[in-house]
Amino acid sequence: MSKSVLVAGFTTRHVAVSAAKAGYDVYAVDHFCDADLTAVVKDHMAFDELDELPFAIEEMFARHNPDFVVTTSGAELLEVPKRLGTSPSAAKRFMDKGETQKFFEEIGIPVPKELGKGQYPAMAKTLSGAGGWRNAVVRSDEELAAWHEFVQFEPYMLQEFVEGTPASVCCLATGGKAVALCTNMQILRGGDFCPYAFSGSMTPCPHPMASRMAEIAEKIAAESGCVGCMGIDFVLTDSEAYAIEINPRFQGTLETVESALG
């Protein structure tokens, strides 16, 4: 009899498809419930707002009592039974981009400098959130004010703007050790609206600094306390790999990683 897994989060398709290919009976709680998700799961439930997610998970447990639970974006901090991967207590620090910045600095990782208001150009980003869709380069107090209104006045930080190639590393971690599985070049949306939104990936990353990035990622993953598959985002220049964020869960590049690794 096949084992079963509930995949829960804002978007779950990449993990659900992988689990189905591995032979699991898959159930999903997902914001979108698009056709290529519903085609591979035994049952699914949609939600609109993230505060509805815990109740949807409870309902799926009542229906199916899955053997395991895997959380994706938006569900990293939920306390759920039978959870696989990084615990909410370990993930919590990396859900705050300011705390992630401090973590990188503490362990001596190359990272864009944090800037104060009035220092431009700067990369503005909300302290919470995923996917990069609210990130923006601002060049004046006026641009910063307009951006802050766009993100509905959420807490934010400013970083030195490093021009380079967006990339990431997929790692496997045990809570104290880690290995880099694959490097990825990220595809961002571009254009005038949400230009830094994640839109896809190419694996492996062909950039000359990819091996340097993988070495740094292994150190980050080992020090992070995370468990299982995780992703670390970077910007690559001609001379350095700058760490940007930690995703303490399966990352959006999972599909290209699996295709590249076979």
Predicted regions and their residues:
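ATP-binding N-terminal substructure of ATP-dependent carboxylate-amine bond-forming enzymes
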Residues: 1-95
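Short glycine/serine/threonine/alanine-rich loop segments
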Residues: 24, 109, 226
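Short, hinge-like loop/turn segments at secondary-structure boundaries
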Residues: 43-47, 102-103, 140-141, 175-176
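N-terminal beta-alpha lobe that positions the nucleotide/phosphoryl donor
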Residues: 54-67, 71-120, 129-132, 139, ...
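ATP-grasp fold ATP-binding core
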Residues: 104, 118-138, 153-169, 181-185, ...
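ATP-dependent carboxylate/phosphate-activation module, predominantly the ATP-grasp catalytic core
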Residues: 160-225, 236, 247-262
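Flexible, glycine/charged-enriched surface loops at secondary-structure junctions
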Residues: 227-233
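Conserved protein kinase catalytic/activation segment
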Residues: 240-242
